[in-house]
């Protein structure tokens, strides 16, 4: 699994990778089909509830995306203790990935400013997903891994739509929150469009890595 660090964002890298955004991993077996169906079901729920409220959709995406790394890291940690075996660095890798997604979430919370009711709904959804993903991971690590890859593909679609709405002026642009500027080392004059661009680039790279 690739860990994307908070490095200086490169506009040239962004445009260089735009042609890769429409990549899709075709399911090759039953496990892949289960992962894709599960992902599409969750996408349907998000589409129904949030529609074109892309800031809120991003909050939901990152809330869910922050779970797999933490769940897998915890289970791998327990396995390492139980079998008294070295994890070969995977626990830290998975927890770093969870932290990266958490910072994405914190960024979009500053942008979307979800209400108390929306926060409660998100909390319930996260609790259900944590249990569900843990069960899936224990039953089939391959399926769990593929789910994360398809999540990243769906995130690419959502961020692309979000960026298109911002660039067309349908959604007003705004200054980037300080937390995003500090985390990704963005220029001080950066805007929401720059934040979405960097998230789109990183998510696209993650989707490509996870769906190999």
Model-assigned labels for residue ranges:
Residues 14-204, 212:
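Iron-associated oxidoreductase/ferritin-like identity signal
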């Amino acid at each position: 699994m690739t860990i994307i660090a908070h490095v200086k964002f490169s506009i040239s890298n962004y445009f260089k990778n735009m042609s890769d955004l429409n990549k899709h991993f075709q399911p090759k077996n039953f496990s892949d089909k289960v992962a894709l169906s599960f992902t599409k079901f969750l996408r349907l729920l998000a589409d129904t509830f949030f529609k074109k409220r892309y800031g809120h959709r991003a909050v939901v995406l990152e809330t869910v995306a922050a779970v797999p790394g933490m769940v897998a890291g915890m289970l791998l940690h327990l396995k390492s203790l139980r079998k008294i075996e070295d994890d070969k660095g995977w626990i830290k890798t998975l927890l770093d990935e969870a932290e990266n997604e958490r910072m994405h979430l914190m960024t979009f919370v500053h942008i979307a400013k979800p209400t108390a009711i929306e926060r409660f709904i998100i909390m319930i959804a996260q609790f259900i997903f944590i249990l569900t993903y843990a069960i899936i991971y224990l039953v089939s690590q391959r399926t769990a891994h593929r789910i994360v890859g398809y999540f990243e593909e769906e995130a690419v679609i959502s961020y692309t739509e979000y960026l298109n709405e911002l660039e067309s002026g349908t959604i007003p642009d705004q200054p980037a929150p300080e937390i995003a500027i500090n985390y990704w080392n963005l220029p001080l004059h950066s805007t929401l469009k720059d934040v979405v661009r960097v998230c789109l680039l990183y998510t696209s790279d993650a989707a490509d890595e996870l769906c190999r």
